[in-house]
Amino acid sequence: MLSTALSISQCLTYWASTREHGALPNRVLVTGASGQLAHFIVRVFDDREVIAHTRTSLDVTDPDAVRRTVADTAPDVIVNCAAFNNVDGAEDAPLEAFALNALAVRSLARAAEEVGATLVHYSTDFVFDGSATEAYDDDAAPGPRSTYAASKLVGEWFALDAPRALVMRVESLFGSPRNWTGRRGTLDAIVDGLRQGHEVRVFTDRVVSPSYTPDVAAATRHLLNVRAAPGVYHCVNAGHATWQQVALEAAQVLGVAPSLHFVTTDQVPLRAARPKFCALATRKLSATGFAMPSWQDALGRWIRGQSL
């Protein structure tokens, strides 16, 4: 018979093991697998069974294909990284934007409910109008100003129809792996330009909270591990800055003398309106025990080649 002390020790060991691994999903289905965020989602769950689908293997805008794939796979979690991210292009192709950013999410939410899976869906800071003077809380009222933003907001609503859904709002994603050939974000382009000695155009009047993709992936794993309550979670690196400040920080980390062309949003013709103040607060994510590092820390880790 085990002693009481040994039994307690074993129980504590088991509890710690469960907290690290047992609460995590065994099978993860990832959509939009050719994108940068999905790349790191697949990596962060490398100790799980991951089924990753690109647009070629699963058209998420086809409800029957979604239902059939989810039923056949029976995942514990669906992580939706598929999205129409061309903000200006959405003004010219609203049907395509809503099909991928909203209706596809409805199909995934319904399929997740049918198999009892948790749905993780990524949204955007663009659901806000940018009129705030301090970082937007997770529960702040949205006010989309473009077709893209509206399609993402409707996608959030559809995602939250699923009984177990985590909607994670990210912003200005960056952190493409070395030799990455896929789509790159604004900060990736800024750093590339600085490295190559090109003149880089940056906004002086847009405030952002950049999101480092490996940190977003780690936060996603954490929320699933602690079985976070369904709802909306802001997932950005701590702090905020103008694109001008971000570019200057990147140049300092790179050790280069930057050639920067400063502009305001009013000076650049854009088809879709952008919110000027996009800082997000991570109150709910922090309350689960996960503290996002500062954007400066994340930028430094990325530029110096540190990632997952």
For the regions a language model picked out, list residue spans one by one.
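C-terminal amphipathic/interface module of NAD(P)-dependent oxidoreductases
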Residues: W15-S17, A273-L308
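N-terminal Rossmann NAD(P)H-binding glycine-rich loop of SDR-like oxidoreductase domains
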Residues: V28-V44
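NAD(P)H-binding glycine-rich loop region in Rossmannoid oxidoreductase-like domains
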Residues: V60-L100
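NAD(P)-cofactor binding segment of oxidoreductase domains
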Residues: D92-V120
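Active-site Tyr-X1-5-Lys
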Residues: R145-L166
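NAD(P)-dependent short-chain dehydrogenase/reductase
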Residues: L160-V208, D215
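Mid/C-terminal beta-alpha module of Rossmann-like enzyme folds, strongest
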Residues: A219-T220, V226-R271, K276, I303-R304
